[in-house]
Design a protein with these regions (language model features):
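ABC family nucleotide-binding domain
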Residues: 2-148
């Protein structure tokens, strides 16, 4: 197995010298390809902060994060944007789909933004939908879909 995610001595502080909040303090973790990992803890324990640092939504104050061998902590702003667009996928609990578009069209829009060739979009969507077992919902609108 190979390392899919690696964190070394991850630190995230908020605030300033007079009012400093240590959200993450020296977190190290490795997740191998194929493993499932759960992040659990009490409210305010740093779960969301940790996920935001891993996903590059927020920069850690210290330490390093590697995703599939790429040290995201060292990427410049433009490189980080390219990495997010081309290598990461996000599924938020409160996703923002366009209500006037079907699930298929919402997915197609994301592929168009990524400059996917028009003639490949349908093929890509159908292949992924088949893998995920969601072909039957592609023509539904967001309000017709379950949040789960």
């Amino acid at each position: 197995m190979s390392e899919l995610l690696k964190m070394e001595h991850l630190v995230k502080y908020y605030g300033n010298k007079t009012s400093l909040t240590k959200a993450l303090n020296d977190i190290s973790l490795t997740v191998e390809q194929g493993e499932f990992t759960a992040i659990m803890g009490a409210s305010g324990s740093g779960k969301t902060t940790l996920l935001n640092c891993i996903s590059t939504i927020d920069r850690p104050t210290g330490g390093k994060v590697w995703i599939d061998g790429v040290c995201t902590s060292e990427l410049k702003k433009g490189e980080l944007a390219d990495f997010r667009r081309n290598r990461l996928g996000f599924i938020f609990q409160e996703f923002n789909l366009l209500d006037t578009l079907t699930a298929f069209d919402n997915i197609a829009l994301a592929l168009q933004i990524q400059k996917c060739p028009h003639d490949k979009i349908k093929e890509k969507i159908e292949a992924v939908a088949q893998k995920l077992g969601i072909r039957e919902v592609l023509e539904k609108y967001p309000y017709q879909l379950s949040g789960g």
